[in-house]
């Protein structure tokens, strides 16, 4: 927790303050309860957080965390394989290039028919977004490793899994984390949409339910919660990056 607090640095505080200033200017310009003031929203957010809001945020966080875990378990080995094997790259990369640009959200109805209306369909949707970023990032990271480094490591007596742990994984880790960082924003947006179908838990459901009830203060409290969830995940990635890739900060 102390490490997390240290990473919420002055730049993060500056960003939050600037968003609040722009939000307040928009609030006083429109002069409508459609956009409540930051103060009112934060006050309502704090009141809701110990109960209903935490429940919805945890449901959304669980879906994203499960999708990230599945994507890494599948995407990293596959990315390493096609990065190291030219034949595998020639066979799989064209398929990836065809599927990667497709809007994954369009497949949600298909996932719901095949997997049911529960969490499985929503998690699968997020996996299809994240896994391509991971696969391509790992593959490209492996390809960028100079052959001379493989020779140097081999001359030191390192072989097999040692090459992966001492050379390949450290080389691809910055790209992998960057890919995760990019895909997280898209994933949260897609999850917001997915949680409006056949579910009663999740921050996306909470926001849209508040909108249908014309409760704009609750709606913006949910939007604030969604933003803070994204901030938490991205800050966690920054912490992991500093731990696993300290050389890029020298």
Which residues does each PLM region occupy?
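Periplasmic/extracellular loop-to-transmembrane helix junction in inner-membrane transport proteins
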Residues: 3-6, 29-70
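N-terminal signal-anchor transmembrane alpha helix
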Residues: 6-30
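Loop-to-helix entry region at the N-terminal start of transmembrane alpha-helices
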Residues: 56-63, 113-134, 177, 218-223
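Cytoplasmic-entry segments and transmembrane alpha-helices of multi-pass inner-membrane transporters
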Residues: 77-113, 126, 137-145, 151
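C-terminal transmembrane helix and the adjacent membrane-cytosol boundary/short C-terminal tail
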Residues: 86, 174, 178, 220-250
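Glycine-rich helix-loop "coupling/hinge" segments at transmembrane-helix boundaries
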Residues: 113, 189-225, 249-250
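Transmembrane alpha-helices
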Residues: 124, 128, 161-193, 221, ...
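Short cytoplasmic-facing helical segments at TM-TM junctions of multi-pass membrane proteins
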Residues: 137-179
């Amino acid at each position: 927790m102390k490490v997390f607090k240290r990473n919420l640095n002055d730049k993060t505080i500056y960003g939050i303050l600037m968003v609040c200033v722009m939000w307040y200017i928009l609030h006083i310009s429109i002069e409508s309860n459609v956009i409540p003031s930051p103060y009112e929203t934060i006050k309502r957010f704090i009141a809701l957080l110990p109960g209903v809001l935490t429940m919805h945020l945890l449901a959304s966080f669980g879906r994203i965390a499960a999708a990230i875990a599945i994507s890494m378990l599948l995407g990293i080995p596959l990315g390493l394989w096609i990065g190291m094997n030219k034949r595998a790259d020639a066979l799989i990369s064209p398929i990836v290039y065809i599927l990667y640009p497709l809007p994954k959200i369009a497949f949600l109805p298909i996932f719901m028919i095949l997997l049911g209306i529960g969490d499985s369909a929503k998690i699968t949707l997020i996996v299809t977004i994240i896994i391509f970023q991971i696969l391509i990032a790992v593959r490209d990271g492996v390809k960028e490793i100079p052959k001379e480094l493989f020779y140097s490591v081999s001359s030191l007596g390192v072989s097999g899994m040692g090459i992966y742990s001492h050379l390949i994984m450290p080389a691809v880790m910055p790209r992998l984390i960057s890919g995760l960082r990019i895909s997280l924003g898209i994933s949260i947006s897609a999850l917001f949409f997915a949680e409006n179908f056949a579910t009663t838990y999740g921050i996306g459901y909470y926001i849209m339910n508040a909108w249908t009830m014309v409760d704009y203060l609750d709606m913006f409290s949910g939007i604030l919660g969604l933003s803070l969830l994204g901030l938490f995940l991205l800050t966690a990635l920054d912490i992991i990056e500093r731990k696993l890739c300290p050389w890029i900060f020298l």
